[in-house]
């Protein structure tokens, strides 16, 4: 009995490394350090690549003239390339009416279905031209509305690397890989993804990240493996819904 419980916990405790804001202009020095570390530990992260980066904050970083070859090389290693918005420029405010009630500015929220499809199609076209297959998406600042999900589905993307929950789950023909915390945390039970913005890191942050990966290496899994963990049904939906409300209340009490 105890052995069965331990096995169940072990099989259902894992983390997907999700890296945000991967673009031509970024902190390339730290990216190279992360790449070497991933190779050493045989970790296959998911990289959120911005297909047409126009974010003024990101454009301040050094530019790689060989960016798309770098992306293809990462992809050949088995790293998952995910579409992270289109141009990473915010044009609307959500007033916490976005799907996950994060609030703040958004690249997609509030736009018409046709406008959102145009952005998504343009992004996907860029990846096709660069010979990179896209199976997943996550929006800048976690902000979506129902049009975003409909546009993604109509463009053939059903995997969203975002949301609340203890487990990856399927809802209305979409798969959601939960992303709960702003720093690397390994829960004692459950499967989620990280949120890593290495452009804002200092050397100390990288060293802490390295320690975290070495400590939890065996529990870090690839995108393909996490897709096999997607669950559905009322029980899973209820757990994730309850967790969502607990997190929202906790965040509200901090302000």
Regions found by a protein language model. Give the residues of each.
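Divalent metal-coordination and catalytic microenvironments
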Residues: 137, 194
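Catalytic alpha-helical scaffold of carbohydrate-active enzymes acting on polysaccharides/glycoconjugates
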Residues: 1-136, 143-189, 201-255
